[in-house]
């Protein structure tokens, strides 16, 4: 244990199991011992690792400082006029100030300035794991440092002439636990500020040659002093956000944003990743999400897969625009991506210029063929022809919304008109024949013959014409294009070809065009033509 004797008081430093500075002796007060750099270094090093909680005053305070008062400072003195216990009645002349009170380690124009500093010493307590910046301030800059009140500071010790007492410094006030917890400090330029006292007491913090600690340098490299807890919390939050962003993949917090289409598309544009209903659970949906999270779905990264392969579902095609120019557009070939703006089907449906039905010279037909070729299929392929027919029928449905649904037996008119007047005038051509008795009798005989066929022959004999509803709008065309597992395929499907999907002869353009009005469904005989033909031979 080391006992440091000062003028009028004794301060003891408690036992420390890590550091026993028994070799230190009280510094002599002669000459300029407190001003020399060696003395400052010795005082600084003696307080490294010291525990401020073990500091206890051994002598009672002086009687003339028992009541708290206001510490008034003169405008011409270099330091403030004492601690918070000095009464306001004392004049600056009554307190003989020594020039030694303005040393670099004295209080920075604050409390605990020494009234008789010839025998007083300032002990600086430094803890390497307690973040605190004690910058060298001018003694006239006290009023500009009020922002440091809420910042916990490093405990320091002050030795005054009348009371040698060591208390931890917590704020810029000047009071001890025996002072009632209040202090009033007057600044040099008549700018006073009232500050509360922390529970453990406070003393004025002074300038110190001690550099920053390692934790502060790491947490606060830009020089702005902040609380270590605040710095650690902000650093933890930033690290957590960065980790979440990196763990989410190259597309930020949503790793599913580019599974179907290029970046910027809707995250659930792919129906494979869309839940079946709100709040429901689907094993397929969960499996697709798991595969996407593991990077197994093609196109899950900007380069495609984990190895950086290009996305197999995205291709670029140069097409002719309706204005006559050329444009390079991305095309999404994902079969599950129907609502994506890059889908060929969506782009075909968006082409809304008027076009008559069956037109092969308009831009719609060329655009459909270009989209089919962009999908990697030749123009003569059944799928390409069906896509072109579907695009043409969709354009015709927008340009001519009025359709004649007149049916006589299995004959369906199906003509389209742009206005209702044209449709009404066309209907007169059908109803005009009924006014003739001979035409009406012929139509009645035809309908009776159709009903007689249905009674004489069983349905199994008419299986090739399945289904044949008598008044179906698409009975004849849909029967040719609709697939039935037991029906004999059309003659064109028997012709084999080198293509695994069947030759071009296995596709019926008329049937595909008729079926395209019902939706983008293609003839199944084009794919299974060879096997079905071999089975029926």
Swiss-Prot record:
Gene3D superfamilies annotated for this entry? Classic Zinc Finger
The residue ranges flagged as biased composition, category Polar residues, are: 138-177, 188-206
Which Gene Ontology cellular-component terms appear in the entry?
A: nucleus
UniProt keywords (A-Z) are: Developmental protein, DNA-binding, Metal-binding, Notch signaling pathway, Phosphoprotein, Zinc, Zinc-finger
**A GO molecular-function annotation:** zinc ion binding
User: Where Phosphoserine occurs along the chain?
Assistant: 98, 157, 208
> Assembly state and interactors?
Interacts with elB.
Entry function: May negatively regulate Notch-induced cell proliferation in the eye-head primordium. Required for development of the supraesophageal ganglion and ocelli. May act in leg and wing primordia to negatively regulate body-wall specifying genes and thereby promote appendage formation. Plays a role in tracheal development.
Q: What name does UniProt use for this protein?
A: Zinc finger protein Noc
Record organism: Drosophila melanogaster (Fruit fly)
């Amino acid at each position: 244990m080391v006992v440091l004797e000062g003028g009028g008081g004794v301060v003891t430093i408690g036992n420390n199991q890590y550091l026993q500075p028994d070799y230190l002796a009280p510094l002599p007060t002669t000459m300029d011992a407190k001003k020399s750099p060696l003395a400052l270094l010795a005082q600084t090093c003696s307080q490294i690792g010291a525990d401020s909680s073990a500091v206890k005053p051994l002598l009672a305070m002086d009687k003339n400082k028992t009541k708290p008062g206001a510490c008034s400072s003169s405008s011409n003195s270099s330091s403030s006029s004492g601690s918070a216990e000095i009464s306001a009645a004392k004049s600056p002349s009554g307190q003989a100030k020594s020039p030694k009170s303005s040393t670099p380690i004295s209080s920075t124009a604050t409390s605990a300035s020494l009234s008789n500093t010839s025998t007083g010493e300032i002990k600086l307590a430094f803890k390497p794991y307690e973040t605190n910046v004690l910058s060298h301030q001018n003694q006239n800059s006290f009023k500009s440092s009020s922002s440091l009140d809420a910042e916990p500071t490093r405990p320091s010790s002050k030795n005054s002439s009348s009371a040698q007492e060591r208390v931890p410094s917590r704020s810029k006030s000047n009071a001890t636990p025996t002072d009632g917890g209040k202090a009033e400090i007057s600044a040099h330029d008549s700018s006073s500020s009232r500050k509360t006292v922390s529970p453990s007491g406070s003393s004025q913090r002074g300038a110190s040659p001690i550099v920053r600690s390692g934790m502060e340098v790491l947490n606060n490299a830009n020089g702005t002093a902040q609380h270590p807890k605040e710095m650690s919390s902000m650093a933890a939050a930033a690290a957590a956000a960065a980790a979440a962003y990196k763990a989410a993949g190259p597309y930020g917090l949503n790793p599913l944003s580019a599974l179907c289409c290029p970046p910027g598309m809707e995250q659930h544009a792919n129906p494979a990743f869309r839940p079946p209903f709100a709040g429901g659970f689907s094993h397929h949906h969960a499996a697709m999400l798991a595969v996407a999270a593991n990077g197994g779905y093609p196109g899950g990264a900007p380069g495609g897969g984990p190895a950086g392969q290009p996305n197999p579902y995205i291709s670029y095609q140069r097409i002719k625009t309706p204005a006559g120019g050329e444009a390079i557009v991305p095309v999404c070939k994902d079969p599950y991506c129907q609502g994506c703006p890059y889908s060929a089907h969506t782009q075909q449906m968006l082409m809304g210029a008027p076009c008559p039905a069956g037109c092969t010279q308009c831009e719609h037909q060329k655009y459909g063929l270009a989209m089919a070729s962009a999908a990697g299929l030749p123009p003569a392929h059944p799928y390409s022809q069906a896509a072109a027919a579907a695009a043409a029928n969709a354009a015709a449905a927008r340009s001519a919304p009025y359709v004649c649904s007149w049916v006589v037996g299995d004959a369906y008119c199906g003509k389209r008109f742009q206005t209702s007047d044209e449709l009404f005038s066309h209907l007169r051509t059908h109803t005009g024949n009924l006014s003739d008795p001979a035409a009406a009798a012929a139509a009645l005989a035809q309908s009776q013959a159709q009903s007689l066929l249905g009674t004489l022959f069983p349905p199994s004999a008419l299986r090739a014409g399945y289904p044949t509803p008598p008044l179906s709008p698409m009975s004849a065309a849909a029967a040719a294009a609709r697939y039935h597992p037991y029906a004999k395929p059309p003659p064109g499907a028997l012709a084999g070809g080198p293509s695994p999907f069947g030759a071009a002869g296995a596709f019926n353009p008329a049937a595909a065009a008729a079926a395209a009005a019902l939706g983008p469904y293609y003839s199944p005989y084009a794919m299974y033509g060879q096997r079905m033909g071999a089975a029926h031979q």
